[in-house]
Structure formats: C-alpha cells, structure tokens
Amino acid sequence: MRLHEALRRDRYRGHVRILLVSTYELGHQPLHVASPAGALARAGHQVRCLDLSVEPFDVEAVRWADAVACSVPMHTACRLALAACTQIRSLDPHIPLCLYGLYARLAVAAATEPTVDLAVAGEYEPRLLRWVDELEGRSPGTLAREGNRRPGESHLSGESDDRPRAVVELGRGRFGLPARHLLPPLDRYARLATSEELLLAGYVEASHGCAHRCRHCPVPVVYDGRTRLVEIDAVLADVAQLVEMGARHVTFGDPDFLSGPHHALRVVSAMHDTFGDLTFDVTAKVEHVLEQRDLWSRFAAAGCLFVVSAFESTNDAILGHLAKGHTAAQEVEAVTLLRSAGIEPRPSFLPFTPWTTAQDVFDLLDLVAACDLVGDVDPVQYSIRLLVPPGSLLLSSGALDGLLGPYDADHLSWTWRSADPRLDLLAQKLGHLAERADAESWSATQAYEAVRTAAVHALGRITPKRPPKSKPWLSSSIPQDERPHLTEAWFCCAEPTEAQLGATSLLPARARADGTSLADATARAADRSLADGTPLADRVSLADRVSHTSPLGVPIP
C-alpha cells in the first residue's frame, strides 16, 4: 500500500478536535502545518488543516474545532494570521487559540490587546502538543461555559494562567512524518519553472535556526545562534511522500542549509542515492558559499539547480550594520564559484534601509547586470524595505539610533524614513512595478530595464544610462529568461503585496479575474508553449502566481 494512501485511511479519531491554520509559506504546501498535524494525529487527536493561501476561510471548520492553532513562520504569515485570529475570535470568542512558529512571540509582543492563549516560537511541536493534551476532555460547550474568559486565562480550572503566554522552546526532539494528506495537493502550490516545463515542487527542512546573528533577521531573535538538526531518516521519509505526490523538485527551506555542512552533505547524498532524478535548491549565506567551496560540485552532481543567497546590499558599510559577514566583493566571488559548478545563484536583496543612498541603488543594479544576474532576481527584490520588528538585534546595535519613528503595530515594525525622500517614493513605485511585471508576464529582462528606468527617473541620474555589460567569466550558460526558479515571486522578509492585502473578502481561494485556477492557467500555458515555442516560464503571469498564494478570505485590519 502506498504511504499516503495508508495515512489517508487512518482517520485519527482523537480526544481534541484541533484546526491548524496556515496563511502563507512562500507558495509552498505548508510544512509548518503538515508536521504538527502529524504529531497531533499520532497522539490521538482529530486534526483538520486549513491553508488560507489556497483555500477560502472555512467557517464550519472553526465551528467544528475545540481549539485552533495558527502557523506564523515569517512576517507575511504573521500579519495575515493576526487578521485570521480576529475573524476566528468573532466566530467563537472562547475558543482556545495558539500562534506557533518563528514570529509567534513577536505577534504577542506587538498586540495591543491579548489575542491568543499561547504563543510558541522555536521548536514548537512538543509545547503545542502539550497545550492540546491539556485541553483533552474539554468540549467546546464546556469551554464556552467558563464564560467571559480573556485570552491568557486557563481553560483547565478557570484561574489565571501563571505561565507566560509567549514562550521560546529550543529543546531537541525527533520529528515524525508530516500529515501532508490533510492539505491540498502539490498542484495547488508553487512549481519549478524551467525553460521547457513547470514541475511539481515540494518543501522540506533539514535544520532549524542558524549559527549566525545577522541583525535584521528574525531567526537569531529566537534561536540566538543555535541550530537544531532534523534527523536524516525523517527528512527522507518526507521527501519520499512528496515524490509519491508527484514532486520532481524539492526546496530545502532551512534559514541556512550550510549551518551544519556535514549534515547537509549527508542529507543531499542520501536523497540523491534514493531519488536520483530529483532536483533541489537550498539557501546559504555568502560566507558559507565561499567556505564550503568544495561542496558545490557534489551538490550540482546530486541535482542542485540554484542557491538562494542573501546578498542584501553592495555597500560594505550597510552590510556591516546588518552584520552579514561578507563584502560586496565576496558576492561577486560567490557568483563565480557557483556558476563554475553549474549552479545558478539567486540573490535576495534589501535595497532600502535608513542608510541607503541613491548611489547604492545604482550600484546594486549595476552588480546585477555585471554579474549576469538579471534572470536570477525576482522583480520584488528591488523594492524590499528594512523591517524592524520588536526584538530585532538592530535595536540594540546602535546602528538605528536617531533614525526610528513610532512603532507601527499594524505592520509589526518600527517606522523609519530615508534621508533622501526620493528613495521612499522609489521603493513604493518599484513595489507596484514588480506586481505589474508579474501581472503582465514581463520577461526578466523587461522587468530589470523597467526598474532601472524608474530609478533613473526618480533619482535623476543622467550618465551612464545603460547598465554595464556582464563579464564573460561571470556569465551564465543559460539564457536570462530561461533560468530555473520557483513560480512564487514573493519573499519572507517583505511586506505583503497589494494583492495579498487586498484579498479581504470571503471569495474562493485561487479565483482569478477570469474564473480560472492556476492549474487551468498552467495547462493552457503549456499548450501555448508547445504550439509557438515560447518558454513555459514566461507563460505564467502574476495573476496566476500571486492568486495561488494570496491569503483570500482573511480580512486585513
């Protein structure tokens, strides 16, 4: 019997009916719902999952549940989850409600009013399981009769809960098989786009946390330089069920896949030995790309197509403020090293910070052109502004002294303005431009040229008007508009898009203006590609990519 069929036949009749909610996981089928769902089900509880990025808000599921837990692994998900919690509370003011994931503690710290009963950051599964176990035997009616309980008060005996509502758990544990059968199938999520086809893609993690303390990153706020490894057999078991579901590519979503390089190599080797045709991508710091230079040829041979790496800036002073641990020159070195191994670099950027100048914007655009990265940068990367959430290591570094405005609770960040007001306007313009680029299916080259033109017009640069030519030793062998990438163009550290923030009604998820789904649009794109030879990656528009990850059905405050 196939693995997922066996899981589906296990009905998990349990003691507490728990609804797990995801709002956004970068277009992937949400691991941070599937994994705790498996743990809770194995403990005997009844579990349902709801992914608001591809499904409508399900009122009946909330009414069915004895308790609800929302996953908040990143900024975008946190903002949307808080809105979902408001809607859940409006349906049932007394339902036990939990937030879990990297942003959970931040969400509680940012709230002006108590919204949840428990927030668990870090290695959340054991604590989440204990919380649900404590609810065992308490029916929804019993909980409601406890009357006018404020969030944070005990469900068990009516007295105030002395434990903190926000906790960080960093204990080591073992992970079981995620209950992916409780979620929509992979064809509802982001895919791998190549020059010829769109392939189903899965998402796994081989480690949590990170050994570094980049000051703008939310990971060290929780993990404080620690890494927790996921057992290789657990990773492979999850990959196996993803392959059985149709995945032909896997994203390793670890904050830094090379925080434990020996573990990473063992995972990759074991996966390749078992699934020889499977391709994958990873995320790695620039300094790790260079330190582990001997790994890349082995990764390439095992199927690594591209590496996401946080370049952030070309200004070494800004990189110092962020404690990135690399220089602009090392970014170029990383590009050379990866390409020599046959792997595409896909840099992420943080173009707009309180320290950014107009020259920095052009330096970044010049780097992209000179390193032949135009086809490797999603347009939204040119528009991202620094977020400064509560607890950010930047707040205690002194780098932001005198630069911050008031705290914005709606956006979960301290505010700031550029010394050059033109930069704030440009960031906003580039955000709108990025959405338009996707909506109209611009090629990577078209998007880059539009971004550069907008920067010239906004900042007044006259010469040179044209970007520098790429250096032969830095160039890719793959045409710019045919490079492998995932069809989700957004990013974890960015504000929600206009499309996401505008998705406030209870419309069916994934509905497009013409009434078609992503799967329908993809099928039509494939047909057109076969007919006229246009690369399939160019046939999937923002309306397709954004709509299949926009959290429809959740009102945003």
Predicted regions and their residues:
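Acidic, low-complexity intrinsically disordered segments
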Residues: 2-236, 240, 244
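Radical SAM [4Fe-4S] cluster-binding motif and immediate context
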Residues: 184-344
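Residues at alpha-helix caps and immediate loop-helix transition turns in enzyme cores, especially N-
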Residues: 32-33, 61, 80-84, 231, ...
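Hydrophobic positions in alpha-helices of CheY-like receiver
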Residues: 40, 84-92, 267, 271, ...
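A structural motif corresponding to the C-terminal lobe/cap of the Radical SAM core domain
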Residues: 261, 272-454
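Radical SAM enzyme core and accessory elements
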Residues: 1-21, 41-42, 46-49, 61-70, ...
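Cofactor-binding loop segments of dinucleotide-utilizing enzymes, especially the Rossmann-like FAD-
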Residues: 23, 52, 102, 255, ...
